[in-house]
């Protein structure tokens, strides 16, 4: 059976070995812990997810990025696309995690974990009641278009900044986290970024 790696493998295929940090956490979940928590997505997992979201979303190959998530229908600005659920929670960062609080890092379920980064995102996030994020369209999205979000909209500080390879004309080059890019995130995505980061704006 063919196994498809998780979000960390997607990053590594692009040479993006990102690690995330909060303002306090300094250690990361081990790769072994992450692997046992997340596992690897078998083709059957992908097929089941695509069946569940048929006519709405599709996990497919994203050129140069491994797997990605694509729209199977049009979405209008502010329209809810999907809700991601936290399947693992920690107070330290991990290679598969996204940050939802100052000392809270979660691993999302499929298909949210496979949404790639872009500096010109078409998707924004809001906190939800299942421990992760709801994903909303922040511009008109056409059928067949890849859904992408800006990782700086959730990560306070990327402890190992990395060179972005999104290919967007608006690519900012080096990704370092909201701490170093707050003006752009607020201007581009308000109100669709992590709630805990908005507390820092006050």
Q: Whereabouts are the PLM-identified features?
A:
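Conserved catalytic SET/PR domain of SAM-dependent protein methyltransferases, capturing the structural core
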Residues: 2-202
